[in-house]
Amino acid sequence: MSVTRRAFLAASGAAVVAHPAVAAEPPSPARRTRFAVSTYSFWQFNPKQLQDVEKCIDLAAEMGFDGVELLLRQMTDESPGYLQRLKQRAFINALDLCGFSTHQGFLSPDKAERQKNVDLTIKQTELAYQLGIPTMRVNTGTWRTSKNFNELMKNRGIEPPVKGYTDEDGFGWVIDCLGQCLKTAEKCGVTLGLENHWGLGRTPEGVLRIVDALKSPWLRVTLDTGNFLEDPYDKLEKLAPQAVLVQAKTYYGGGLWYTLELDYPRIAKMLKAHKYPGYVSLEFEGKEDPRTAVPKSLEMLRKAFDRA
């Protein structure tokens, strides 16, 4: 005879009442926060810095991280052999490959261009699957009405839509395009994490509008602590319940585009209040040598989260 969960719990409760002398089990110890580092931290799109992803994995292990987040644009090869070498390199170093950071752009009135980026995102999802990575960072893309990324940053991430179109058009395109990617995400077991990363993801309301519209467990949020340039804490908290990966920015030596004085003890307490269980992945974006700044960042983050 089967026993329902409700009946089991009721019987268990009765047993406790009947035997008051039985001591309650002590609470389980709090889970330790796991820290990863993005390979971007060592490279930063700078040809003078370390691009070799395998060496970045080795450094992550030497510095005491638990995992590594791979930046696709940093990888020099996408062949199966190369992907499996990266996976083995992480395994040998006892590191998780915990995140895959990719780029795509859906803010274009050109339907063929949008479809090209849908196909790209599907391919990227399949690469994440081959690497055994459970979550992949995705973006809305930008309107590309800025001359370059430096100008976009000078304007605090704000840019006008393409002439003749509005953000409302853009939301429809992004929702449609990401919706087309979800079947592959489910098939591959890769949770897409929409990042608060410029474009229509510049605000928490924009990110949540897209995620809530699709209502899929395979589209959640990648939460970047450094992409809300004003009043970040309330904005970060709005996204925390949906977060599957947290990217923690640091800026030792001064930021490449800007510097934020982030209160990590406050951020850690907020994430703990929302019972965030996942990885905190360091994205170092400062001018100091990564070989000194990355370990310094890890030490700071550990202290903040251990005390939360």
What label would you give each PLM region?
Residues 72, 104, 140, 250, ...:
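Residues that line or immediately flank small-molecule/substrate-binding pockets and catalytic motifs
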